[in-house]
């Protein structure tokens, strides 16, 4: 893709002393040469300017940019490559159409009226929690209403009421959601910050600043996947074997504030969008306030629309107080993305008339004064009214009548919400998982289109290669010679062939990563389904979330599960999505990787963290472990078929050494533990048996000392906790009914660890079965040292289990 337009990319910067050179033949690898001075566009001087001292602070910290249409048109010609004739066409479609101008005005009034009603209802206590209003920024949803289509994917942040309205989401349902009512968009499960609507592809409503950016990239990727695989959504929004139309021009639109755009996720988004030529539009809502802090106080780059230059992503700046100009310029940028030329940025300079939320005291420097000034001087509705009554397009009576109609609609929305019922209490638990914990994944049918899609996307040579690879692994599995990593790889290939909507993301994917988990996936399914990713787990977990919301089944392989720390926000939202959306959006996602802490691991603290314990508190996640090839294979297959997010932890030091047979073509349950060794009846009768609960490397440690325990006349029920969440209390109960004593060999810390949770549940639910306190053998709270001489004090092993069992039986504990 050629961006010759960057040859003149900022003729607009000519007035600055900073040199800016971009080669005429610049594509995604565009090179930028600049002096040591920072590049500042004169278009952005009001955004970036700061007062020299507190005493010299002007009455308006952020003056209007007064960016007229001729300058916007100049950007479209110089940066986006439009001809002047094309630019004039975009202007004419708005300026010469009274109907279009009427629709823009109605959208402005609808969004203002809706937000005012929300504020009133909030003050009356009918809307609860956090709420963030959009007053003053109405030109942006008006653009949505004008130029965005129903099939486009829309991702917003927590200030999204108006974006949902403009996307066609029913206003009564939005208001009902804010009222916590069952008729709300998400049945009252989401609230103000989490508006979702599947029929209009309005996909949030995300509460963590900038988290929505990689999700939107994943949604854009799903559009490319549809086109590549030749599948599309049916009337139930499920994939079927009908190719998107030849003129499919869907895009993904994502909104972020200029403060949120300083987040590193923006750079990752631009890189990903440019690399894959995603049909993605980044809309930057530039109100000059990062929450309420003046953005210039915390960020040196207010010209977010220029951030894409280094990636070959063009940007446009518009004045958000002129709704007609926003519609003209915004439509041109949207059409640029629709045409397949790649991603783009639209920055809208605007003012927010309200505080961050209704409860905000707004103590930040200059905020109250700016707000009062902007309401008088920079109201986009008043500016529109003055402009189009002065030039005779509308009479005051016409405007009043349109406003009256819109406010009547808003009143009806409030009435609908107020009269709607509250959701039933049992709905909360029903929304925990899309698939019940006891689901039999063997009964889930494969997509009917699998063979057809495989035939048109995998060449005969590729199919022959992967078939031979699968057969080789299956023979190893039958012979008991397959490793954990290879067993997972086998399951992944079988599932990717069974269901072509399955995708995979990983670092070093082409090379098979560290344990061959994604081996041969890109060589077989191509880069569109098997993506090598940048070194940021949060980014590609986020992209997987966006794919999962849009009909795909992403797999994420973590080279080491501890690297998932970079993706905690995305993991949290993956777990919450099904419930938060009121059950509208399934969230299939399989995360798999090697982790845990083995004795004598010698990897140091960062690679030895109990990440499985960290994610235990995330609602909606199913968390499993696998210490054998059989468990790894069966669990992986089930997770890929599950409609919710699942996380499989495998033991890092056993990935290649542990070998065994596999029950081929069988999905394992995701809610069951496994009894690996059963104590003899004689030991149970003599009170010399103990239930041992463990997982990951603890399984091997326990197996290594079982003979030693038995040699002393004792015995154990050895239970592998293959499901940490949900926890299999039935298997634990059945064992304790025999042994009445339990030891937990735990690969997590004393405080907040897995063993702490299990111990608490046993004490609460099975206390009457215990003859002794629960014996926890867990990691110390200290970081895991590199040196083995110190590590022994932190990480428990087989010898600790022997002592723990002996102490329980001899009543020394």
Where are these regions (language model features)?
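Internal gly/pro-rich beta-alpha loop/helix module
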Residues: 595-644
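Conserved acidic/glycine
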Residues: 40-140, 354-356, 361-525, 770-813
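Cofactor-binding active-site loop characterized by glycine-rich and histidine/acidic residues
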Residues: 116-120, 124-277, 296-305, 310-312, ...
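N-terminal chloroplast transit peptides
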Residues: 2-49
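Thiamine diphosphate
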Residues: 142, 201-422, 503, 516, 520, ...
